[in-house]
Amino acid sequence: MRNLLLLPLMAMLFSGCGDSDLTPEEASAKKFDVILTVVENGVTFSIKTYVATVDDKDKVRGYFSDVASLINSLVDSGKVEPDVVKKYIADGINEKVPVPFNTAVLGALDLGLSAYNGFYAANVKDNLANKEKAVKVLKAIAAGIQSGVDPVSGDVNVLVNPLIGFTDWKL
């Protein structure tokens, strides 16, 4: 019985075996697509899960839409440093979202913001050429929010599985 449980896990791991024909730039772009997909899908899942637990779904969806607007305005301003992002979003949520929803909204966004902080620290902090990638991660968070509040579809922006062909996850 245990062996049967391992089959799907092994299939998932080995289906991502590397495509050795990729140039380093192509491999890096593909890995970055994986990061964007994971962040967007994670935020979407988190928000859909939270919205499913509350009574006033429309009100909560409105709060999350406000947060997506906050993130988009932050991206437009060009200030993408994690400390600025965290403070701007926390202040904006506390201003626009009443208690106790503000804490829940921040909690639902924690996955995406943690991923952003880790990505920034690893890839942008010492290499400002990657700042545009940081902007794309923030946009993926906003897209995940918008997908999460959509009561009908919730489809994400990525149409193909970016995990195909990878085993090396370092940019």
Identify the residue ranges that each predicted region occupies.
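Cationic, hydrophobic amphipathic alpha-helical membrane-interacting segments
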Residues: C17-L171
